Amino acid sequence: MKSLSLLGVSSLALTSLALPTMNQNQHRFVALADLADEDKPQAIKDAFNHAWKGYMTHAYPMDELRPVSNEGSNPLNGWGATPVDALSTAIIMGLPDVVNQILDHISKIDFSKTDDLCSLFETTIRYLGGLISGYDLLKNSGAMNADPEKVDVLLKKAVELADVLKFSFNSTTGIPSNTLNIPKQTTDGATSNGLATVGTLVLEWTRLSDLTNKEEYGKLAQKAEEYLLNPQPKSNEVFPGLVGGSINIQTGKFERASASWEGGDDSFYEYLIKMYVYDRSAFGKYKDRWVLAAQSTIEHLKSSPLLHPDTTFVGAWANGALVKSSQHLACFDGGNFILGGRELNRPEFTRFGLKLVDGCHKTYANTVTKIGPESFGWDEKNVPSDQASFFTKSGFYINSSGYVLRPEVIESFYYAYRVTGDKKYQRWIWDAFVAISETTKTDSGFSSISDVNAAKGGSKTDSQPSFFFAETLKYTYLAFSDEADWQISRSGKDKFVFNTEAHPIRVRN
């Protein structure tokens, strides 16, 4: 049953804002939608606490909660992905009880044992990133009054994890395999790896080297990255800076000529500029490659719906032609352009990023639930017959209608708000949060849904991914919380940079 509230374990105060003449469901909705800005951080904490309580009650110590069936699931090695992914958000929200629960859990993880094949990419961004971020946020900060010994365990566990993962780089090129059998220290034997799965390791592994004074971790990821920075053959770099999505592990050569900012490619480009934020002096080449990719994206992948020329999306390039489709996953791109524009003092990148933010906002604003779909298109030649009027009105049609609590649209709203100061983007974040809360809440958490363009989101599909804690709730909270070292600055040098799982990593001094 659809809940029209965001009442978590500590949000009874919200009901007091309701009009007594309205029924309970209505007044809870009004209370959430109409909260004053100063009350919004607590409402977001309440959402976190509601989901956390459900996880701890029904799923701990498994990876994730199924918030409809109230069961646990282990899609991420069975080490408790939700606690590790939630740690940095709990620190930022100032939730000491949750932080201490998570620190106790982490101390018990044995990373050498798992019954499942492991993704190097997912394990790096969620577990390794979560551990390093927790350490960066807590070490010598006095935050949460955390036990210093428990804080030190975070770095110890990060080293343990990297040590059981590093065999993945044992190829003739140093390009890692992604699918690993950790107990046997073997790979699945795949001959290729993806652009993002190779190119989204360098921040976490480099930071681990900096924290431990052991160069090997960063060198492993940076050696693999060199093949992405110097793509061969050049024919598979379809436009300057934009490369294909698959690379041969044994030869280091790209296997196809394509380009996109979608899943599978996305966070490679994201990390190019973020490594420059991490250390401008050491990663200038990464920045140069990002600039090439950004310029080529504007020139070759920018696209607008026929009837909505003021709407801007980024398409993909395949088989020598522009593909007019995109994904929720790709909607991080607006924030990445905004970050790059601010970092490089290149206002043309910031302006383009804001156009992308506006385009992705329209995928939310035009659906029944006010949540954007998993994937969408705008090719006037491929409009589904049952979406003709929707396409005319909105400028896009829905290819995949589900929503799995993804953060990317809110993430880009956050960057837009922090860099411009325009409260419009803050309002858009709150609108999205209200819509997600209204549509996805269950008695024990928040659930993925089947159809963003159907009443009540269609059906609840029983997944609460760990990134809902790490990313979706964090970016929402940050937009309404006070200035802090981990916030993106409007200008100047950031003290932290977010990994692709929204874990704040302290930049080099």
Swiss-Prot record:
Metabolic or biological pathway, per its Swiss-Prot or TrEMBL entry: Protein modification; protein glycosylation
Subcellular location, principal: secreted
Signal peptide positions (record): 1-18
Cofactor binding annotation: Ca(2+). Can also use Mg(2+), but with lower efficiency.
InterPro entries named in the record: 6hp_glycosidase-like_sf, Glyco_hydro_47, Glycosyl_Hydrolase_47, Seven-hairpin_glycosidases
Cofactor dependency: Ca(2+); Mg(2+)
Superkingdom: Eukaryota
Keywords: Disulfide bond, Glycoprotein, Glycosidase, Hydrolase, Metal-binding, Secreted, Signal
Group of enzyme by EC: hydrolase
Binding locations of Ca(2+): T500
Function (record text): Involved in the maturation of Asn-linked oligosaccharides. Progressively trim alpha-1,2-linked mannose residues from Man(9)GlcNAc(2) to produce Man(5)GlcNAc(2).
Subunit structure: Monomer.
Family, per entry: Belongs to the glycosyl hydrolase 47 family.
Protein name in the entry: Probable mannosyl-oligosaccharide alpha-1,2-mannosidase ARB_00035
